[in-house]
């Protein structure tokens, strides 16, 4: 529908032709490609407005994907920054269409419903912002909670059933989780907020692809690594992870898992995941060494040069870790296991796979990160880990 209603949609084809034209020349291919695109448009008599649009798309063809998959879309500052970049609804729509086409055209394995939802969410939120509807955290919080309560009433639960659980959760939980997820978590936890046993629940993802898992247990430094270790042992890939800590010291973590959920035995799969992961968390066995899977022929011959970037976030309270490396089985678990060894806890994990490349982002917290010496040591160990 957006494509059909977009004026001069042929401009998107021009941008698509030039978006990767400068790869392999050295330097930033987006910037170099913008120069080529401007020259082409000028040589072929395009007016300034259309030339600027094509150049904008070529220069920023990776920006929307990176913003949607690596940043927290519940953060008002993220929306402000992205809206300031795109400036107009026309630029936004064009960039959205090009981004979707670029990802889907890369490989069938690269595109999934989760990436589609992230991009659509960013598009709709930014469109509202450009239309004058500036995000209001208080209003967003009220709307999220009201919709979650409405869903809970459909299960014949009273309006105050959630009070004890919700009192332990901070604002960021309600802004980062959707109403459907909040209601799902509440249905399983409201009557056992202070449980001594780990709780693990699984369901088919509402987005229509993959599985969602909820883990609720007393928080521990290596908890995230333990969970990742289990998924790794089952050859399950994490698409997204949202980690929350309640005010009384419990971890409320949710995971989106890539999995073929369209088979007749999916209920048995959900039950098995719940039972096995709960059993692993109860037994608390030592973390097993990661087992790296075989890499594809392309990865062996054209490995991704590993990179690690660790820096304080905008508020200076936590640290943002960005990692780029060749994707392989066991990679995420090996990273989280190393972080646990440094007594660093993961607050948020954004997992992005682009073909053979893994680009993961983590929001971290830990006293060891306040030491510059330990920061350098952690970065060095991560680079060694990521090297093939």
Show where each model-derived region lies.
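Regulatory modules associated with amino-acid/nitrogen control
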Residues: 77, 81-388
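Divalent metal-dependent catalytic cores for phosphoryl transfer on phosphate-bearing substrates
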Residues: 2-136
